[in-house]
Curated annotation (Swiss-Prot):
Gene this protein is translated from: rpl37e
ZnF region ranges: C4-type: 20-38
Cofactor(s) listed: Zn(2+)
Function (record text): Binds to the 23S rRNA.
GO CC terms, sorted: cytosolic large ribosomal subunit
Family, per entry: Belongs to the eukaryotic ribosomal protein eL37 family.
Designated name of the protein: Large ribosomal subunit protein eL37
Keyword Metal-binding: yes
Family annotation (PANTHER family): 60S RIBOSOMAL PROTEIN L37, RIBOSOMAL PROTEIN L37
GO molecular function, one term: zinc ion binding
Alphabetized Pfam families for the sequence: Ribosomal_L37e
Taxonomy, superkingdom: Archaea
Record's cofactor remark: Binds 1 zinc ion per subunit.
Amino acid sequence: MSKGTPSMGKRNKGSYHIRCRRCGRRAYHVRKKRCAACGFPNKRMRKYSWQNKKVNGKRIK
């Protein structure tokens, strides 16, 4: 297989992410065995303050 742009078209044969058991989103990475959305199989849920927009529309820098 060659490097570069021609080999990028061969990447869409399978799927990297399947449905997560905990959150139900299609974000569980099969090879990494980790959900990109909720962090499963970690015990703590993955959540950050920057995921949600502020209610009053102002972002704090």
